[in-house]
Amino acid sequence: MDISEEKKRRIHELIEELNKYAYEYYVLDNPTVSDKEYDKRYDELVNLEKETGFVLSYSPTQRVGDTVLTQFDKYTHKSRLWSLDKAQNIEQLKEWINRNEKIIMEYNRLNEETLPMPTYILTKKFDGLTVNCTYDESGILVKGATRGTGIIGEDITSQVKTIKCLPLRIANNNLIEVRGEAIMTKEAFDKYNEKAEIPLKNLRNGAAGALRNLDVRETAKRNLSAFFYDIGYSEGNEFKTYMEMIGFLISMGFPVDPYIKECKDIVEIKDEIKYIEDIRNELNYDIDGIVIAINHIKTREVLGYTVKFPRWAIAYKFEAEEATTKLIDVEWNVGRSGRVTPTALLESVELGGATIKRATLNNMDDIIRKKVRLGAEVFIRRSNDVIPEIMGVVESSLENTEEIKAPLKCPYCESKLINEGVHLFCENTLSCKPQLVKSLVHFASREAMNIEGFSEKTAEQFYEELNIKSIGDLYRVKKEDLLTLDKFKEKKADNIMNAIENSKKPKLSSFIYALSIPNVGVKTARDLVKSFKTLDNIKNATIEELTSVKDIGEIVANSVIEFFKQENINESIKELLELGVTPIMDITEIKKDNKFNGKTIVVTGTLEGYTRNEIKEKLEALGAKVSGSVSKKTDFVLAGEEAGSKYNKAMELGIRIITEEEFNEMIN
């Protein structure tokens, strides 16, 4: 065997090992090797592929590329992806069950080969983006696609490969299409928003936006997960029951949600619906209902389909936070980054116990894709108590409506707007009021310079009446200036002056966060300080040095480098330092012998002595990793009052549960 064949053999060997380790880590939640050992093998594979040019499509190195696509190609599914009919209440569910059981009894009366009375499989209805993954006769993932119309979707193969729990190769020799739901966990959502210049609004948008992003690097940053639940097309695999199909998916290494319940009647189904509704808010991801499907495949074939839906399955929808109302106008707002975004102004409507008058419209592409027009009736949806989003329009209401036009000039300073991808930006960073006001508010925020009492209204007063036109101008304000402002008396003026003075000695990580470096949130700022110790070291760090820091990839690293290349940024920092701002080192050495160093901790319930942010900071200062969900990798669950399902899961897994009192004793 020559040297190149030996290297090819080693590449095959490494791919098999690494894919096995990924399955154990992401699907089984039971890793058998350390991160260090995995990284060692991964680096060996990268080097061998680079040296030989021999790269297999199912290599783990192909999960994340530097690909930026120009468009999404259409893909025709081998078997239709059906929508599900919906039951909004138990009575509608009973009607569905009774209707099907009558059809089955009539079939059995007319045929010798009878069908069994149905049992029903209950699974969660995930609130993400449906994906259809095709594997060829060699078991290799060759296509990933969106649902689209159900017949034709969009090719998102590069994007789905970034989902680390998705197998790139399976031990199956038949052409097969596997369906699932790509989701963003709450943990991944929080972690992404810590670093994001423009935070995500909800989990569903996080998943859907990632998979429909032409820049695969952006998709990878979202750290998506997935659950698979159906085989839509198979040339060689036959199943007698749905449970048998699920067993096959598990055996092939697909991530399958452990909640799968078989029920024999409406009484058992009602009990399960109540159980899922009770634990819904404790889950690490969003669901919007339960899918109820007949288990027996032959029965499914007999029941067949309507024009729109399979008769053998139905979705029980939880009480929806959705409504229909009229779009009156669109308001264009400028953010801290200069991004100009549309907000819908609506006729008032009650939704989830709140009166809704405004809703999110992400950008012009979103407006065009959803066919949103002024005067149209629109569907709005509210998730996790955030500002609602327009999901689409009532087609019948489009007559006599008006097109929404993108502004050509900034709605505040009238500077010409520029297009960057799907977004509009105002480049007038020096005198565009909303940009400067929001920058001042961010700079003064608690996680940044912590200038107590400095609100957005105060920032607007400073801008309009004191001619504050830069961050540095904050430190030139005098008490007599403040006393000229409306509602500023002696005490309030003294408080603001003291707060500004006290902010001059921030933690270095807080100062870094206050600078508004794109993609650098609170955690990344701390990671930078922990690794580089000083501001100058961070400013002068190379791409290699930055990406060697855990959780910092090329996108964040490039953001840091490009930020500190800007002359006006360096001038602003120099100005702040000359005005007396003196950042101090804030990372203390972790005592290696503390009981939480290197451990994974989950916090649940309400603590008496700490807010969620405070306990997270405390644990991270002790060297712990704070996770949002309980798994076999969890070392401790810190439980406060009204601890929920995380407490129960910890009990099931035998994970040590500690009270707040025990925690305080352990750290002291």
Swiss-Prot record:
Its cofactor is Mg(2+); Mn(2+). The active site is at 125 (n6-amp-lysine intermediate). GO terms for molecular function: DNA binding; DNA ligase (NAD+) activity; metal ion binding. GO terms for biological process: DNA repair; DNA replication. Its EC number is 6.5.1.2. Zn(2+) binds at residues 410, 413, 426, 432. NAD(+) binds at residues 35-39, 83-84, 147, 181, 317. Residues 591-668 form the BRCT domain. Keywords: DNA damage, DNA repair, DNA replication, Ligase, Magnesium, Manganese, Metal-binding, NAD, Zinc. Pfam families: BRCT, DNA_ligase_aden, DNA_ligase_OB, HHH_2, HHH_5. It catalyses: NAD(+) + (deoxyribonucleotide)n-3'-hydroxyl + 5'-phospho-(deoxyribonucleotide)m = (deoxyribonucleotide)n+m + AMP + beta-nicotinamide D-nucleotide. GO terms for cellular component: cytosol. InterPro entries: BRCT_dom, BRCT_dom_sf, DisA/LigA_HHH, DNA_ligase, DNA_ligase_CS, DNAligase_adenylation, DNAligase_N, Hlx-hairpin-Hlx_DNA-bd_motif. It comes from the Bacteria. DNA ligase that catalyzes the formation of phosphodiester linkages between 5'-phosphoryl and 3'-hydroxyl groups in double-stranded DNA using NAD as a coenzyme and as the energy source for the reaction. It is essential for DNA replication and repair of damaged DNA. Belongs to the NAD-dependent DNA ligase family. LigA subfamily. NCBIfam families: dnlj, PRK07956.1. This is DNA ligase. It comes from Clostridium tetani (strain Massachusetts / E88).
